[in-house]
Curated annotation (Swiss-Prot):
Site feature: Involved in the stabilization of negative charge on the oxyanion by the formation of the oxyanion hole: 121-122
UniProt-annotated location(s): Cytoplasm
Pathway membership, UniProt: Amino-acid biosynthesis; L-arginine biosynthesis; L-ornithine and N-acetyl-L-glutamate from L-glutamate and N(2)-acetyl-L-ornithine (cyclic): step 1/1; Amino-acid biosynthesis; L-arginine biosynthesis; N(2)-acetyl-L-ornithine from L-glutamate: step 1/4
Gene: argJ
Enzyme class: transferase
UniProt entry keywords in alphabetical sequence: Acyltransferase, Amino-acid biosynthesis, Arginine biosynthesis, Autocatalytic cleavage, Cytoplasm, Multifunctional enzyme, Transferase
Reaction catalysed by this enzyme: N(2)-acetyl-L-ornithine + L-glutamate = N-acetyl-L-glutamate + L-ornithine; L-glutamate + acetyl-CoA = N-acetyl-L-glutamate + CoA + H(+)
Site feature Cleavage, where: 194-195
Family: Belongs to the ArgJ family.
Database matches in Pfam families: ArgJ
Protein name: Arginine biosynthesis bifunctional protein ArgJ
Active site: 195
Organism name: Bacillus cereus (strain ATCC 14579 / DSM 31 / CCUG 7414 / JCM 2152 / NBRC 15305 / NCIMB 9373 / NCTC 2599 / NRRL B-3711)
GO terms for biological process, alphabetical: L-arginine biosynthetic process; ornithine biosynthetic process
Length: 408
């Protein structure tokens, strides 16, 4: 797909409240002691929406309730999110609590119940403290201030070290249209869809079914191509809300600027996916794997994700060890048909394998390059024209420490 890059501009100071019609809030309520733990995004009008969800067969109560909301009309006007408690594996009481959270939001913001989505993230198997939720929702007063957009970003974090935001402006029908996103995710990241939350706002004029098609396709190339530890969560999802307040013609696949919109949505999703991978628990380096010359895009993506998900590759990168043997071993494990005699591998643009034969390289130069924060592995299969990418992070001693002590 050709993306009209000239029509898409990154807004460095933009946020989820930059698109027309959106406001946000994040507050401290006691779910995470003194940290922000409850937030909301609210739209001035019922917004077209789309969502993708975890493929884990154990699905948390908030996710079930949000599915119910979106299925009703394909519209949302508010998203309420808490952190510190996942409300997962909490039985019928957990489901009732999630529905009550939705009712509380509808009553507080004055909107239809099925226009409210709910999300939770945190420890699994602990009942949601509804006394805190009831009091907290009643105090949520969203604003269009950028500072409150940042507060929302903080309110959805768990073991994350940083907030994750991005924003782009595009030109549709000659008018400025904005799309922005926020995400959380640090551990249990192996989406398909899983282990992270992302909320995207836009003032684009686009209907639910068209937006759903775009999001589902883009998710497969972005969020589903990141891995931190190979675990798939019970809670997580991506939701897009489109207010339509940019007042362009309805965007669909026949629209002359369709590729521009899809390109901007992909940039938002890819930015957030990379930020999640880079902020993996205990991570010190972002790893990007690009597979080129594959027979199909799906095969390229499968190999890329196999490599970036390998614990041996991740630990080698953490130790700044150019052990390309672990990379080619991962390629062979991918169950994708390859020619074992035509593989090239570069590590930080330095050739380590050519036609499946080892290459001589400067150890000093390689050591210097592997000390960088972002590591790029390129694999050339020489089988076709298709490419695919995946993102992850190194595996450190700190990851074990964080997860050994998570509940405490």
């Amino acid at each position: 797909m050709m993306i009209k890059v000239a029509s898409i501009t990154k807004l460095e100071n933009g946020s989820i409240v930059t698109p027309k019609g959106f406001s946000a809030i994040g507050t401290v309520n006691g779910l995470k002691k003194e940290k922000k733990d409850l937030g909301a995004i609210v739209c001035d009008v019922p917004a077209s929406c789309a969502a993708v969800y975890t493929t884990n067969q154990i699905q948390a109560a908030p996710l079930q309730v949000t599915k119910d909301s979106i299925t009703a009309e394909g519209k949302l006007q508010a998203i309420i999110v808490n952190s510190g408690n996942a409300n997962a594996c909490t039985g019928m009481q957990g489901l009732q609590d999630a529905y009550e959270m939705r009712v509380l939001g509808a009553e507080h913001f004055g909107m239809k119940e099925n226009y409210v989505a709910v999300a939770s993230t945190g420890v699994i198997g602990v009942p949601l403290p509804m006394d805190i939720i009831r009091k907290g929702v009643a105090t949520l007063i969203p604003t269009k201030e950028e500072s409150e957009a940042y507060s929302f970003s903080e309110a959805i974090l768990t073991t994350d070290l940083i907030t994750k935001e991005t924003c782009y402006e595009m030109i549709i029908d000659g008018k400025k249209v904005v799309i922005a996103g926020v995400a959380k995710g640090s551990g249990m990241i192996h989406p398909n869809m899983a282990t992270m939350l992302s909320f995207i706002t836009t003032d684009a004029h686009i209907e639910h079914n068209v937006l759903q098609t775009a999001l589902s396709q883009i998710t497969n190339h972005t969020f589903n191509q990141i891995t931190v530890d190979g675990d798939t969560s019970t809670n997580d999802m991506v939701i897009v809300m489109a207010s339509g307040l940019s007042e362009t013609r309805p965007i669909n696949m026949e629209h002359t600027d369709w590729e521009t919109f899809v390109g901007a949505l992909q940039k938002v999703c890819e930015d957030l996916a990379k930020k999640i991978a880079q902020d993996g628990e205990g991570a010190t380096k972002l790893i990007e794997v690009n597979v080129l010359g594959a027979q199909t895009n799906e095969e390229a993506k499968k190999i890329a994700k196999q490599i970036v998900g390998s614990s041996l590759v991740k630990t080698a990168i953490h130790g700044e060890d150019p052990n390309w043997g672990r990379i080619i071993s991962s390629i062979g494990q991918s169950e994708v048909a390859i020619n074992p005699n035509t593989i090239d591998i570069t590590l930080q643009s330095i050739s380590v394998l050519k036609n499946s034969e080892p290459q001589t390289f400067s150890e000093e130069k390689m050591k210097e390059r592997l000390q960088e924060d972002e590591i790029v592995i390129n694999v050339y299969l020489h089988l076709g024209e298709e490419t695919g990418s995946a993102w992850g992070c190194d595996l450190s001693y700190e990851y074990v420490k964080i997860n050994a002590c998570y509940r405490t």
